[in-house]
A protein has these predicted regions:
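Extended, hydrophobic alpha-helical segments in both membrane/secreted and soluble proteins
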Residues: 54, 114, 133-137, 155
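Short alpha-helical interface elements
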Residues: 40, 55, 76-90, 102, ...
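Active-site/acyl-donor-binding loops of N-acyltransferases
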Residues: 1-14, 18, 95, 144-205
Length: 205
C-alpha cells in the first residue's frame, strides 16, 4: 500500500485538518489513549542493549500473523542498523521505562518504507499502539519531507483508514528445472499470498 503525502502538509496538524470528522475523531481518540507512551528513537547502543526485547516483541506479532513465510534472525535489527546507519530507524514505545512496542523505518530517497514492528498484546489493546504507530509514521514522513510512505500488504483496512491506497504489485518467478516445479511454485506463491476481502476506507474530506 502507498500513502502519498500531500504537498500542503507541513505538520501532523495539517494532515489532521484534512481528515473528515469521523476520522479526525478517531485520530484524537488514538492519540489520547496513547498519551502515556514514552516514544523515542533508539540509538545503535540502545538497539544492542534491547536486542532480545525487540526480537521478542517482533516475534509476538509475527506469531499471531495469519500467514508468515519467514522468521527474522535474532540479530536482524541490530545488523540492519549497523549496515544502513541513519537510513534505518527504530522507534521504541516505553511504558514505565519498559519497552512495550517498536516500529522501524527505511529511508529510501523520497520514499519512507515502513519495516517490521512489534508490540505487547496487552499494551496494544489498552493504548491503541498499532494505530498510534501508523500516525507516528505519517508524522515522520511529513516532518522529513517524504513524498510517499510505503506499507506492506497486511492490515490493509486500518492502513487505508489513515490515507494509504492499495497498489497493485507483480511478481515473476520461474523455476529452471521443469514444468512440474513451476506448477508447484505457482501453488506455493498462491498459498503464501491469499486473497483477503477488505473494505477500503476514505478518511479525507
Amino acid at each position: 500500500m502507498i500513502f502519498p503525502i500531500r504537498q500542503n502538509w507541513s505538520s501532523i496538524n495539517d494532515y489532521c485538518l484534512d481528515l473528515s470528522k469521523k476520522y479526525r475523531r478517531r485520530y484524537k481518540t488514538a492519540i489520547k489513549k496513547g498519551y502515556s507512551i514514552d516514544r523515542r528513537e533508539l540509538s545503535l547502543n540502545e538497539i544492542r542493549e534491547l536486542n532480545n526485547e525487540l526480537f521478542r516483541l517482533y516475534k509476538n506479532v509475527s506469531d499471531n500473523a495469519g500467514v508468515n513465510s519467514f522468521i527474522l534472525s535474532e540479530n536482524h535489527f541490530l545488523s540492519l542498523k549497523q549496515h544502513l546507519k541513519d537510513d534505518f530507524r527504530i522507534f521504541g514505545y516505553f511504558k514505565e521505562d519498559i519497552l512495550v512496542g517498536f516500529y522501524s523505518l527505511i529511508l529510501n530517497h523520497k520514499s519512507l518504507e515502513t519495516y517490521f514492528l512489534g508490540y505487547d498484546q496487552e499494551s496494544q489493546r489498552e493504548l491503541q499502539m498499532y494505530l498510534n504507530m501508523l500516525y507516528d509514521m505519517t508524522r515522520f514522513a511529513i516532518e522529513n519531507k517524504f513524498e510517499t510512505v510505503v506499507y506492506a500488504r497486511t492490515a490493509m483496512e486500518i492502513k487505508s483508514s489513515i490515507g494509504a491506497k492499495p497498489n497493485t504489485m507483480h511478481i515473476y518467478l520461474k523455476h529452471t528445472n521443469s514444468l512440474i516445479a513451476n506448477t508447484v511454485l505457482k501453488l506455493i506463491v498462491k498459498y503464501m499470498n491469499p486473497i483477503r476481502e477488505w473494505e477500503e476506507r476514505h478518511p479525507f474530506k
